[in-house]
Structures are given as structure tokens and as C-alpha cells.
Amino acid sequence: MTSLSQTGEKDEIDLRAGLTYATHDGVALLGDLYLPKGAGPFPVLVALHGGGWVQGARNAFQHWGPHLARHGYGLFAISYRLAKTGQKTFPHAVKDALAAIAFVRASAREYRLDGERVGLLGASAGANIAALAALGREAAIFAGGGAPEMHAPVKVLVGVYGVYDVLAMWQRYQEASPRENNIEKFIGAAPMENRQLYFDASPISYASIANNKIGVFLACGTEDDLVDRRTQTDAFLLALKQAGFFVRTCILAGAGHYWMNDPIDEPTSYPGFMAPRLLRFLAEKL
């Protein structure tokens, strides 16, 4: 574990890099914790990177971690188990996210965090996992021991160009590259083999009145040619509203996919457009 200080234009943040938050299947799972300076306790977001369930890294949040810390929020960017051909990671990756939530709650005093004000943030495939951890935490498929903190509700979910209906995304992969269908790698089966798994792995399945105390922020671009806005963000938004959720949206005109990792302070950047809107949402709900 590495403890560093980073100096920004106005203040400093603490970075606790390489924290082991869990060990699953003999592999230590690591996270980087970005912290504000000061006494705290601070609200915190557990953040999951994108990468189609098969790749990606937690340094995807190297801009968002410092930015949120300078505005009074902790961010715990985690690595989670990635799928390979013949090695599925559903529901394992969701359990990794739940373990990260338990870690920040159990370590709240040590890291000046508020264990009652915890949220989830995810981009693309990471938004799928984050949404499942937020909304599906009590489902039987994600149960199986663990600390009680794993299954306590979070306060907010932030999803950026996420996948909320894996069957619809499976169809999209089939049209583009049927031999490299990442949904099948993640779930371990085609829908014709096990439709229940596709229901279980879709956050839209958990958009229920019982879950509607969680505040939700959804962002996506109008020109995303990888994750279809209509069948994913728009459909999820409708289901959430029908179930009575508090939802805020940030629709970015002209934006495609992959922009979440861009610098926030870059003039006219998409993250720069989203950042103040996200902060307003967090101030209200987290």
C-alpha cells in the first residue's frame, strides 16, 4: 500500500494506492482510495472501471478521484475479476463490488469516511456491475455469506454509458462480432442456454419499488455506437421512474463512448460538462 499526497491548484488530496479490499479465488483484489484533506468523515463512492467485463484498470479514475476529493468526496477505485473465454465472472464481479463496499464501511474510521454515506459509480461494463451491486444486493445469486456491510443499502448509484439490459447488449454483440461476445464471456452462457442468468445479470430487473430509496444519476452520449442509448440508458431510466426512483440524467450531445477517462478540466470536455451536474446530484443525495 502506498500513501501519497497530490497537490492541486487549491488544495491537496490523499491517495492510498494499492489497498487490498478482499481476496477471492486466491487473488488479492486492490483499490486506490482518493481522500480529501481534513478531519472528515467524508462520503465515498466505490468506482468500477469499464472494459467490456474482460479488460480495463482502476486507473481509469485518475482524473475523477482527485476531482471528487477536492470537492469533499472519497473515491475508492477498484480492480475486480475480469472474464476470459471459459472463465466467467458473473456473479463474481458483483460480489467483488459488494466486498469493496464492506471494506470502506469497515475501514471508515481509519480513512475518515462516513460509512453511512456510501455510493457506487461505474462506467460501461462497470456501470452494469455497480448497478447490480446497488439494486440487486439482496438477490439470492449475490448472497452467500460475507460481512453484513456487503448487503446494506447504498445511498446513490452513478452510471455512465452503462449496460442495464444484458440480453439487449448480447443482441448488439451478435450483430457486430458474434465470435467475440463479451456478454457470453461474462455470464458463461448464451441466452438460449440460460435465460434466467440474463435476467439476473440485468440491473433493469431490479428497478423495483422496494429499491427506490437509492438516488440514481445516469449519463450517456447521443452518439454512442457501442452501447445503445435507447435500449440501455433510456429503457433503464423509464423503469426507474416507473418504480418511483429519484433520477437525474446528463445527456451529452455529440458524445460517443469512452470519454469518461478524459481530463475533467480540459476545455469543452465531456467529463467537464458532467462534473458540476454530478456534484449537484451528490450534494443532494449523498
Labelled PLM ranges:
Residues 32, 217-219, 228-286:
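C-terminal catalytic histidine-bearing segment of alpha/beta-hydrolase fold enzymes
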Residues 8, 168-206:
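Mobile cap/lid helix-loop segments that gate and shape the active-site cleft of serine hydrolases
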Residues 1-39:
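N-terminal cap/lid segment of alpha/beta-hydrolase-fold proteins
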Residues 166, 223-228:
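Acidic catalytic loop of the alpha/beta-hydrolase fold
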Residues 44, 69-79, 119:
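A fold-wide structural signal in alpha/beta-hydrolase
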Residues 41-51:
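Short beta-strand element of the alpha/beta-hydrolase
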Residues 57-64, 76-115, 264-271:
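Catalytic nucleophile-loop/oxyanion-hole region of alpha/beta-hydrolase
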Residues 102-173:
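Primarily recognizes the serine-hydrolase "nucleophile elbow" in alpha/beta-hydrolase
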